[in-house]
Amino acid sequence: MKRAFILVLDSFGIGATADAKEFGDVGSDTLGHIADQCEQGLANNDQRQGALRLPNLSKLGLAMAHKESTGRFAPGLDADAEIIGAYGHAAELSSGKDTPSGHWEIAGVPVLFEWGYFTDKANSFPKELTDRILARAGIDGFLGNCHASGTQVLDDLGEEHMKTGQPIFYTSADSVFQIACHEETFGLDRLLELCQIAREELADYNIGRVIARPFIGPGKGQFERTGNRRDLSVEPPSATVLQKLAEEKQGQVVSIGKIADIYANCGITKKVKATGIPALFEATLEQIKQAGDNTIVFTNFVDFDSAYGHRRDVAGYAAALEYFDGRIHEVMELMQEDDILILTADHGCDPTWPGTDHTREHIPVLVYGQKVPAGSLGRRETFADIGQTLASYFGTSPMDYGKNFL
């Protein structure tokens, strides 16, 4: 019986890529810089103290993969751990350092075209675009129209939004159009309808995602985003390994978290909603228990990126990594003889880096299974090696990009 479990630690980069200079990210290193801060006692909070401890991920080869990527061991990680899995680091072939590009490339389809972007920091959106969106939605105006941090924009504009009923439109360095609205005063269904209108009106702009950012709270300093985020993505430009498994092998692809949104539901046969790392873990364990032959269980742990990476919260990121490390054995204990587990990421988001954007980094490729030989996979030239490996494992037609590493 063939089953694969893919766990994406969203934004967990392990060192800058050779092309990082093109993105302003030379020297970025999500794992390494978190470990440095922990070692120096600068990442303590009520959940964790001291050096970064990831014993289980180190056994799976994380410390070695980081060493091969950067030339140094991350402090605190066990450099002498007995390795029980295959490990490597992968560079990105795609033109961007965004979530869809990273995930699509993982599934064998790199993004070789350029996304559209809203590059102006203020007055970011063309008036003709916003006029059409507002007219279709029956709304008399909007707030924002700028590049913004998702949490800061709520403090800046949340109260005005509640008073006026006008949605908050904002963007970032990624190919995104984000809409923040209060779940209670504006309404979640109304927000999702507005996002669908925006998705349709953005067809000619080549924007990767429209993101619904619902929030709650009575006022400034008390607003918080809810778990009802939705990502409305465009479809991948060609069939991913997920689609090939579903169509060629009548297999099952179980999306946990925001995976289905990222792939615009293409190739997804079952969707499981969960919010927060503990709930995502529980959902993953439950779906593994239920999984039959020719099944991929695919989970995105978005909080590493959204709650800690973008917010530049080193201590929070470290605590989340240690929590994840403490539970990964639960997945491994459910694995059968032919199963494979792949731990990876979609880009970096170094919480010590200037700004709030993603960073262009290698991603870890950690592979475990009873039949997977332990040892180095070296540097992989594309994330698509993961997709090609899955295509070979499940016996689908090959992908156009990537090399099988098993």
Curated annotation (Swiss-Prot):
Keywords: Cytoplasm, Isomerase, Manganese, Metal-binding. It comes from the Bacteria. Its main location: cytoplasm. Its EC number is 5.4.2.7. Pathway: Carbohydrate degradation; 2-deoxy-D-ribose 1-phosphate degradation; D-glyceraldehyde 3-phosphate and acetaldehyde from 2-deoxy-alpha-D-ribose 1-phosphate: step 1/2. Binds 2 manganese ions. GO terms for cellular component: cytosol. It is found in: Cytoplasm. GO terms for molecular function: magnesium ion binding; manganese ion binding; phosphopentomutase activity. Mn(2+) 1 binds at residues 10, 346-347. It catalyses: 2-deoxy-alpha-D-ribose 1-phosphate = 2-deoxy-D-ribose 5-phosphate; alpha-D-ribose 1-phosphate = D-ribose 5-phosphate. Its cofactor is Mn(2+). Mn(2+) 2 binds at residues 305, 310, 358. It is an enzyme of class 5 (isomerase). One of its GO terms (biological process) is 2-deoxyribose 1-phosphate catabolic process. Isomerase that catalyzes the conversion of deoxy-ribose 1-phosphate (dRib-1-P) and ribose 1-phosphate (Rib-1-P) to deoxy-ribose 5-phosphate (dRib-5-P) and ribose 5-phosphate (Rib-5-P), respectively. PANTHER family: PHOSPHOPENTOMUTASE. HAMAP family: Phosphopentomut (MF_00740). Belongs to the phosphopentomutase family. NCBIfam families: deoB (TIGR01696), PRK05362.1 (NF003766). This is Phosphopentomutase. It comes from Vibrio vulnificus (strain YJ016).
